[in-house]
Amino acid sequence: MEHLGQVFRFFREARHISLSEATGGEFSKSMLSRFENGQSELSAQKLFSALSAIHTETEEFTVAAGIQDHHSHKELLSQIQDLLQANQLDLLEELYLEKEKITQKSKRASDWVERLIVKAYLCALKESKKASPGELDFLHDYLFSVDIWGRYELNLFSVCTPVLSLDLFSQYTKEILSRKDFATLFANNRNTLHTTFLNGYLLAISQENITQADYFQQVIERHFYEENETYFRIVYLFAQGELICLKGKTEEGLTQMKKAVDIFRILNCQHSADYYQEALDTAFQKYSK
């Protein structure tokens, strides 16, 4: 993609940074010059280093370079929310069929993305709904053909997680963690990634898959929450309690789950407290037999 070098040079010159400074001492300025002139490419690692040296966020660069899709599908998401609030699931199914029909004639990625978004909501609402092999293949190819992820790709992954089986969710998480741009991705999108890892943890626990639950717990522990990320800490405390129950220590697990609910009540987070109290009641009936 020859234009990437041109976009990089635009940011570098706009900030009055020399070629030597822009390399960050990581590679030669002649290599950077060839990249800017479209004569060669830079590895992802060198590009991240150079972007840091010219004080440019990865997402700022990807938007300017046209790598990141500006189409955020806000109109579609708003339409879906309206249907959900009106409890018109039949119309949501019709919307999916409409999107499916469009993709039978169109190869545009944005059309397939919209089809997947609607399918994801259907899967979340109805266990009987499953993504087709073609939809799953498209999602994987679309996400992992992008060299540099930004908020768009992460949000798309987050929205589409209901179409994934636990094994696929785990596979995608491993691929995200192995990306060269993961450190930057995590720094710029902590909430989204915290939510993703926690959802994987909760999914594994709900399916009573201790091996996968232990994996997601390790991921969470390696990228643990700051003190100002209290909500994540409380939900994680609750989920840990259920995993303890699943491993046979019912009294200890239920006590920990109750502790999380009590914290929500102390903080006057009544909606969250009521939601997790209901989950605690269900767990009590399940594990106290």
Task: Write out the residue ranges for each language-model feature.
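Amphipathic alpha-helical segments of tetratricopeptide repeats
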Residues: 96-104, 138-144, 177-184, 217-226, ...
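Alpha-helical adaptor scaffolds
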Residues: 153-230
